[in-house]
A protein has these predicted regions:
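A short, polar/charged loop-to-alpha-helix boundary motif
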Residues: 38-48
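Short, low-complexity, polar/charged sequence segments that are solvent-exposed and flexible
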Residues: 49-51, 193-194
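Internal maturation/activation junctions in enzymes
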Residues: 1-5
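Flexible gly/pro/ser-rich segments immediately N-terminal to CXXCH heme-c attachment motifs
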Residues: 45-47, 53-57
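C-terminal, surface-exposed recognition/capping segments
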Residues: 6-7, 15, 22-24, 28-36, ...
Length: 212
């Protein structure tokens, strides 16, 4: 079944009412601000400052990494949380998927891509169900990552939402899945596979009206 954007019943809106947000799941991936990965390290813009007109460029000083206790620190600080691949990566220059998924870790044991191509935008990637994203042994996942939807909350991710990632280079977040995903689209679906220059028919964004 197909529906036009925003034309579903009120029950499909986030609050079940006529003024709720529609199409949070499916339709198109939504680019979101304030969260990214850089070489697998999870980085955020603190205090919801990304809702303002702040610098979110690749080298912005606003980005912060996350420690196990939830502290926000400078990117590259030892012990910050990262998305580490479970399976070894590949040096193949092809855009191939690597099975095994990811774990939250304080170091990167396995990058998806281990080659030396200058353009790393579309090399190897991985995926797993978001609910299966677990910490490595002895690693603590802070509440802030669960609140940001960057790590699953216990008992809160029962659907088949998928987590996609390339844990090398800068990757910008999109959420919610698209019409391509079918039953795997879900509210927890998180897409950290592409660069900020990526364009595709099933990736969009949510605009906001501003009185200027």
């Amino acid at each position: 079944m197909r529906t036009l954007t925003g034309t579903g019943p009120d029950l499909w809106n986030h609050d079940g009412g006529p003024w709720g947000v529609s199409d949070l799941v499916g339709n198109a991936w939504d680019w979101v601000s304030g969260i990214r990965t850089f070489n697998g390290e999870i980085q955020v813009i603190p205090d919801n400052d990304s809702a303002m007109n702040v610098d979110e460029s690749p080298d912005s000083p606003c980005w912060r990494a996350v420690l196990e206790d939830g502290s926000l620190v400078a990117p590259g600080t030892p012990g910050t949380l990262k998305y580490d691949a479970v399976a070894p990566g590949t040096d193949s220059p092809e855009d191939i998927g690597i099975r095994g998924g990811y774990r939250l870790n304080t170091e990167i044991v396995n990058f998806n891509y281990t080659g030396h191509e200058e353009d790393i935008s579309h090399r190897a990637y991985g995926w797993n169900f978001f609910r299966d994203l677990a910490p490595a042994e002895s690693v603590t996942v802070p509440q802030v990552l669960k609140l940001l939807g960057a790590a699953p909350a216990p008992g809160g991710c029962s659907d088949d939402s998928v987590f996609f990632l390339r844990n090398y280079g800068e990757r910008i977040a999109a959420r919610g899945g698209s019409w391509f995903d079918g039953p795997w689209g879900g509210i927890w679906e998180l897409y950290l596979r592409e660069t900020r220059a990526f364009i595709y028919p099933d990736i969009g964004f949510r605009s906001a009206w501003a009185d200027v």
